[in-house]
Amino acid sequence: MSVFAASFEPYGAGQKAPIGALAPATIKARLVAYKRNVAKRYRIVAPDQISDRIPEGNLYISTKVDGELWFLVKLQGEVAFCSPTGRVIVGIPACIEAEKQLSGEGDIIVAGELFAVVPKG
């Protein structure tokens, strides 16, 4: 049994739970609030528009990749990718690596863009 969802189905090397499956209501509320209050303000700006469209001051920037907003969540020692729609992914290599890297740390939520790199060929 996971702290994230009641049931999962196989998903590659891990497991996934469908839309609405994310169990902790407080976590889901935080993910939805982040999407509503922060992610909706993300902007794509061409280099020649930076001085016109971006306000002065301290800013956080990142490269846009064609992914989806997901969160890496560590809760009660378990690590999962969780979406604002309530989907959950556990047990994939990225989750296992994150669990190793975050060992000894408390609960955490990290916003990011989930995407897959397709091997050339």
Range-by-range predicted roles:
Residues 53-121:
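Covalent nucleotidyltransferase
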Residues 1-19:
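Intrinsically disordered, low-structural-confidence terminal and linker regions
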Residues 12, 35, 100-103:
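Generic secondary-structure transition motif, activating predominantly at the C-termini of alpha-helices
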Residues 14-76:
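RNA/tRNA-interacting regions in translation and RNA-turnover enzymes
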